Amino acid sequence: MDALNGKIPTICLVDDDASVLKATSRLLASSGWKVESFLDPIAFLRYAEASKPRVAVLDVIMPIMNGLEVQTELQTVSPSTRVVILTSKDDPAVRSKAMAAGATGFFLKPVDDDEFLAGIEAAANGTKSS
């Protein structure tokens, strides 16, 4: 992990499935990342506006707002936050739209741990992974 100025970057997880949040949070934390998890995308956007996290991992299919809508709003409230998509549905149109809007990675659930961690590292360092 590449820390910025000795500070561990925050990775935010946004997913409406608590079990996915728990497992993904555990994976990231065990690799040394600081993790904040959100079931509610609105609460996440409020947090992001105030805290400017380095990376946001967004599910696509969620109630209230889908991941692409969250990504669009995030560009307004925290434009420096990099987005990684983590979804259960491999939809080429969604992948294309997310990447065109600036996502640095797109991963399918269940995720390959090593590939996902490499994608988070790339996002935190400002590069694209997939």
Segments from the language model and where they lie:
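Short hydrophobic/Thr-rich beta-strand motif most characteristic of the beta2 strand and flanking loop
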Residues: 32-39, 47
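A Lys-centered signature of the CheY-like receiver
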Residues: 109
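Acidic catalytic/metal-coordinating carboxylates
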Residues: 39-40, 66-70
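Active-site beta3 strand of CheY-like receiver
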Residues: 51-57
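Non-catalytic signal-transmission and effector/linker regions of two-component phosphorelay proteins
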Residues: 1-12, 18-25, 114-130
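Receiver (REC) domain active-site loop signature in two-component systems and cognate sites
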Residues: 62
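Alpha4 helix (beta4-alpha4-beta5 surface) of REC/receiver domains from two-component response regulators
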Residues: 69, 90-105
